[in-house]
């Protein structure tokens, strides 16, 4: 088993939720020796500005990189050229207005607030959708010549993204730029929109104790995924210890 060089973690319900647990995660992270502390990536459905504001409110360690908007945005404070390169890698032609025209004709769908939208992410609410309902949405988009990716999680949140974007694809791209192998990386999460990170080949994962069944099912399929008994940030600490990361 290779040493860990990178952690990519979801925020809400994973390292954010219980401030005491978040503080314990921060202290655990800061206690790691400088030569063993992995690159820290926050990988959330929140947009970048929202994540930066959150960092002012909760006791998290400072990340090295931020992936936002379910894999549609990258913030790299020390390597800003990566931000432009990643956006360019997603291609052109994604049109939220055209997507909205299609979605507004679908029963049961409502658009999320403006603060959850941006030029490469169209976000909606659709409660308790099954595979057939999601398939109908995908077919309606294709009929309108919209080739996009649908990410559905928490039996409610529906994100429509460029075909090349999701949390996993963004992480794989970043690891490639940093020359860090996926087998040297670990991911942590709690819902279905984190699933794309776990589906990357050779990556290891931590599924926190409060995770939804849509993600917990992965723990029963592959021993690369550790299902913590502890919840939220305490569960991430438990998982990192399982994968051999400990303060000296």
UniProtKB/Swiss-Prot annotation:
Induction field: By salt.
Activity regulation as described: Inhibited by the phosphatase inhibitors fluoride, molybdate and orthovanadate.
InterPro entries in UniProt: HAD-like_sf (IPR036412), HAD-SF_hydro_IIB (IPR006379), HAD_sf (IPR023214), SPP-like_dom (IPR006380), Sucrose_Phosphatase (IPR051518)
Domain of life: Bacteria
Pathway info: Carbohydrate metabolism; mannosylfructose biosynthesis; beta-D-fructofuranosyl alpha-D-mannopyranoside from D-fructose 6-phosphate and GDP-alpha-D-mannose: step 2/2
Matches recorded under Pfam families: S6PP
Annotated GO biological process: disaccharide biosynthetic process
Keyword Hydrolase: yes
Protein name: Mannosylfructose-phosphate phosphatase
